[in-house]
Amino acid sequence: MNRSLALLLIIFFGVFSHAQFLTTSGKQILDKNGDPIILRGVGLGGWMLQEPYMMNFVGGADNQQQFRSKLESLIGETNTQEFYDNWLDNFVTKTDIDSIASWGFNSVRLPMHYNLFTLPIEQEDPGQNTWLDKGFEIVDNLLEWCKDNQLYLILDLHAAPGGQGYDQGISDYDTSKPSLWESDANKQKMVALWDKLAERYKNEEWIGGYDILNEPNWNLSGSEIRNLYVQVTNAIRSHDTNHIIFIEGNWFANDYTGLTPPWDDNMVYSFHKYWNVNTQNTIQWVLDMRNQYNVPLWMGESGENSNAWFKEAISLFEDNDIGWAWWPWKRIETTVSSLSITSNSNYNAVVEYFKGNASEEHTV
């Protein structure tokens, strides 16, 4: 084989390999065929992380840890574990993913709780990472369902080690322990988790990318959040140069102080938008950022509103070539998500007991 032909083959297969993955080019996200794509997705909130409002236990527990602790005190550790095992096995199934695809979506965002992948720092020696099978099994199964339906799966670290914000419910933050930002050990564990995930999924073309931290909300300097994000990026890139890295700003993905310019050439800025009006000026700040830094945008989370608001928001995003992911796919007793879970008297009794509105004898 002559050198010119060999070089052409290297270029061809290199381009072909790169085009198999969701990637970026200037201000656009490109699909596996290299064509511009608008991501239209849903977030699977409430599955791997139970936020109080989604479970209807606001006033009964501030976060998942409190809810689980109270449940253990009421029904015991064995029964509580059985509840969580059944929850994880049944909250999202292949039927959900089949439905998401059949309804016209092309992507899914998976909010992950770190404690399904590794132990808290309080339960390990310094620097140790004990890997747990459950989290990886959930991602593996979900990825297979997404492959079957040709949906891109975006991994989202929703609850980081220690919790990344003052809002306890969003990240399962325990105020009695150091947060992500107050503990080098928690930061190291977060980096190690993304290192592990990137190593495992580096060759998976239906992984759409890595949303490395959901909605941080903490008094931070721009350099503090950037330094952690760069560490995570470096860990990912040590294994995986294929996948997009999605970056959320501080204060619920709306403050990008210190996070510009981009430090990676396959990066997307992911903002969130809730409740404000759907006019051009409400997103002009992110459009300006896109234009200044020649980087794509993704509206990675919005919802909890009326159908009229949803329609206006989607029109606004798509008129500006911005993909979106709706939140959430389902939750208990609601009219503002795609699906609503019908509660039952036993669950309602437990919640009312946690809120102090019922006695134990009328609950168990």
Model-derived features: positions:
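Non-catalytic C-terminal accessory domains or segments of carbohydrate-active enzymes
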Residues: Y347-V364
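Bacterial Sec-dependent N-terminal signal peptides
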Residues: M1-Q20
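Extracellular glycoside hydrolase catalytic/binding regions
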Residues: F21-L22, E182-I332, V336-E352
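Short, acidic, Ser/Thr-enriched surface-loop or helix-capping motifs
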Residues: D31
